[in-house]
Amino acid sequence: LSRSSGPAHQQPQLHRPLIPAGAWSIQKRTSEATISSAVSAPTAAQALLERRGRGSAAFAERFDVVHGAKHVLPSHPRGAGLLTVHDFLPLDRPGDFGRLKRRLLPGPYLASIREASALVCVSEATRDRLCGYVPQARANAHVVPLAGGGLLSVPDELVSELQERRFALVVGDDSARKNLRFLVDLWPAVTAEHPDAVLAIVGPPSWKGEEQRPDPKGVRRLGFLSDGQLAWAYRNASVVLCPSVLEGFGLPAREALDLGARLITSEDPAMCEVSGDRAVHLRAVDPGPWVAAITDAMGGPRHAGSPPGGVRQWSDVADETVEVMQRVLHS
């Protein structure tokens, strides 16, 4: 999580590789002269505008495939509709959202899923959630996992606050589902064993701007980092922690493994899927096992080793997404 995160951060990562991927009609749309800007609006209003085919001149044009990269498709797309499904947070955890989003987002999300010619899910866990809400969509849903390899080629930039420190890294916003408070509250038990240990939190404050209790000694909230600083933090952390209670994919876990970090995650299905047997998985409700695993990692080597085989790149995600598009066009 550097300048941004989630689907909004992943869209440019995905679409850049489509140009050299030879993606026929997509390639024709990539010159600046053919890019149409959209009206800027709050998330819920943006979803409604896109569903109604408004807010951009592009909605009046004809395409081979209309790709909804972030949850929503126009209700009558001028071309086959391909929808990328990241998660179901407005339905799974409505209490995390304000009243307007709770009321307005689920309808466009579910309608887009039902009307899409094909669906791309970012994980098997997300496809399982999809089929729970829209069972008839199972045959139409393809899994194309995301990638974390974007930081591999980025030169490291030192994070001065963490220089020569033993630290655990957690990447994510401070919303309830990310469960960062769970780590903050257990940190005094870690510093009882390792007095100089630092919990480095990278990311924005809570979506809802809740008032925060004072953090205990050793907790550092770093806000946003550049890509180079984030890469440095992953590579130099004693351990990366992912205590989230619900994810669509789990990009920080993927990035941590790709950069050789030791990793502890919750037992969330998406987290377990993305990290497999290369991470320690613990229930994120009992602090005892987490304290034991973190203190063990603080006393061990910083690196878990290189990932086996090749690291998945965003070009792989683009290629597999194009394959689904081709099936849609030829079906």
Please name every model-derived segment.
Residues 1-331:
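Carbohydrate transferase catalytic cores enriched for Leloir-type hexosyltransferases
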